UniProtKB/Swiss-Prot annotation:
Quaternary structure, from the entry: Homopentamer.
Gene from which the chain derives: hldD
Residues of the active site: Y139 (proton acceptor), K177 (proton acceptor)
EC number: 5.1.3.20
Keywords: Carbohydrate metabolism, Isomerase, NADP
GO terms of biological process kind: ADP-L-glycero-beta-D-manno-heptose biosynthetic process; carbohydrate metabolic process
Protein name: ADP-L-glycero-D-manno-heptose-6-epimerase
Length: 331
């Protein structure tokens, strides 16, 4: 049967298509918007049956043009957390998603979509419950509102509906995201270009570079998606993160020392990186004040209760592997 992936040329989407291909799934319809044409590079190594623009997809899916569809992985959305056009975000991230969910329910098709840890805002608890959801941006609100729509449909849903709340995902295939690429990718590119990594200084009770996020490897994200594909009776909203918050300082140490190792240079401790000017701290930008999550850490209890038992890749291992991958490709 056909599997449809929206946002297929994007970061998570293209990696998911590769993960499906690795299992022998090639009857895949890729849906995206190639307004950013350079995203096509992510699809070059993918085996797909067809490609559609997102604006053409919904009507054709509603008409049943793809026959029996096993699952729709909905990863297409505006992922720019700094986007200020609320109408655009609500149309793309909320209304489009809501229409697609209803079509999947009507056709008895598994629906697995991308939510975001942005729904939690500055909450100090990251559990999938309404009382902990306090988005700081209109992007986070668009994701939050669709999650509420999903909750309102779950009780009567006869087919699978799964929302996956991604924390800070990193890995191959994200370079096109520019300022929305992971901290790992940004630090790698900055150090290669300038010989230093620049982090946020003190802000909101967090010391220089001590802002901490839950960094999760794209490999783990793909595995979680495939788990729910294989377990169509599981529905709900689930966090997808390592369960461990790591500081930007921690990540920078791994990035810089991986690059130093490639030049046969010894690793340096955080204090040494700062002393040698390889790590600098900048004033926290005014544009992010009141809109930035200084701390995130996934509560994976619900995911584990659903039966997902695989361990998550440790930050040190995953970041070093990703940096080596970038080096091998001359990036």
């Amino acid at each position: 049967m056909t599997i449809i992936v929206t946002g297929a040329a994007g970061f998570i989407g293209s990696n998911l298509v590769k993960g499906l291909n690795a299992r022998g799934e090639n009857h895949i319809v890729a849906v995206d918007n190639l307004h950013r044409a350079d995203k096509f590079h992510n699809l070059v190594d993918c085996e797909i049956r067809d490609y559609l623009d997102k604006d053409d997809f919904l009507s054709r899916f509603e008409r049943g043009e793809f026959g029996r569809v096993r699952a729709v992985f909905h990863l297409g959305a505006c992922t720019d957390t700094m986007e200020q056009d609320g109408r655009y975000l609500m149309e793309n991230n909320y209304r489009y998603s809501k229409t697609l969910m209803e079509l999947c329910l009507a056709q008895d098709t598994q629906f697995i979509y991308a939510s975001s840890a942005a729904v939690y805002g500055e909450s100090h608890s990251f559990r999938e419950a309404r009382e902990y959801e306090r988005p700081l941006s209109v992007y986070g609100y668009s994701k939050f509102l669709f999650d509420q729509a999903v909750r309102n449909r779950l009780d009567g849903a006869l087919s699978q509906v799964v929302g996956l709340r991604y924390f800070n995902v990193y890995g191959p295939g994200e370079a096109h995201k520019a300022r929305m690429a992971s901290i790992v990718c940004q630090q790698f590119e900055q150090f290669r270009a300038e010989g230093t990594v620049k982090l946020f200084g003190e802000h909101g009770g967090h010391g220089p570079g001590c802002q901490s996020h839950d960094f999760v490897s794209i490999d783990d994200v793909v595995k979680v998606n495939l788990f729910f594909l294989d377990h169509p009776r599981r529905s709900g909203i689930f966090n997808v993160g390592s369960g461990h918050a790591r500081s930007f300082n921690d990540v920078a140490c791994v990035v810089v020392n991986t690059l130093r190792a490639a030049e046969d240079k010894p690793p340096l401790a955080l204090e040494e990186l700062v002393q040698e000017g390889l790590l600098e701290y900048l004033r926290f930008p005014d544009a992010l004040r009141g809109r930035y999550q200084s701390f995130t850490q996934s509560d994976s209890s619900r995911l584990r209760e659903a039966g997902y038992t695989a361990p998550f890749v440790a930050m040190e291992e995953g970041v070093a592997r990703y940096c080596q991958w970038l080096l091998e490709r001359g990036q």
